[in-house]
UniProtKB/Swiss-Prot annotation:
Region (Disordered), start-end ranges: 129-158
Species this protein is from: Anaplasma phagocytophilum (strain HZ)
An example Gene Ontology biological process: negative regulation of translation
Protein's recorded name: Large ribosomal subunit protein uL13
Family to which this protein belongs: Belongs to the universal ribosomal protein uL13 family.
GO CC terms: cytosolic large ribosomal subunit
GO molecular function: mRNA binding; structural constituent of ribosome
Key words of the record: Ribonucleoprotein, Ribosomal protein
Gene that encodes the chain: rplM
Parts of the chain that traverse the membrane: none
Lineage of the organism: Bacteria, Pseudomonadati, Pseudomonadota, Alphaproteobacteria, Rickettsiales
A Pfam family recorded for this sequence: Ribosomal_L13
Role: This protein is one of the early assembly proteins of the 50S ribosomal subunit, although it is not seen to bind rRNA by itself. It is important during the early stages of 50S assembly.
Feature: compositional bias, Low complexity: 144-158
UniProt cross-references to CDD domains, sorted A to Z: Ribosomal_L13
């Protein structure tokens, strides 16, 4: 029996909608990275972009465990001498960049190569409940119901 290898024409991509309200960022990002890579499919092929497209809504209401909302620090560099910038998740939320929290977490779980960059383009994150992908008919996934640890707050473990 020969080893199965997926061809480019055989890839079947679907759209997945995930509501990030009161969800823990790390667990959510790990699950999104798995979907983007396609590891949840039986026909997973490591060198192909066989993952699904993911739409995340309500990114502004994600949660961190413990005190990470104020203690965790994201660093970036402008490229100029002395240009090291830092901000906390609280700063990002107050400045209106809630999408970046999820995007950075998922990006760091995907890897560094050209295939990871192509897979990352299949992620769409919105801070509110509205998204512009109704024409793609995304399938809603209830991430909070998969495990009690996935969420914090009132609707955790629905």
């Amino acid at each position: 029996m020969r080893t199965f290898s997926l061809k480019a024409g055989e890839i079947d991509k679907r759209w997945v909608l995930i509501d990030a309200s009161d969800m823990v960022v790390g667990r959510l990002a790990a699950y999104i990275a798995t979907i983007l890579r396609g590891k949840h499919k039986p026909e997973y092929t490591p060198h192909m972009d066989c993952g699904d497209n993911v739409v995340v809504v309500n990114a502004s209401s994600v949660k961190f465990t413990r005190n990470k909302m104020r203690d965790k620090v994201y660093y970036r560099h402008t490229g100029y001498p002395g240009g090291l910038k830092s901000c906390t998740p609280n700063d990002m939320l107050r400045a209106g960049y809630a999408e970046r929290i999820i995007k950075v977490a998922v990006w760091r779980m995907l890897g560094d190569g050209p295939l990871a960059r192509r897979r990352f383009k299949n992620l769409k994150v919105y801070s509110g409940p509205e998204h512009g992908h109704h024409a793609q008919k995304p399938v809603a996934l209830d991430f909070g119901a998969m495990n009690n640890k996935n969420g914090r707050g009132n609707n955790a473990g629905r």
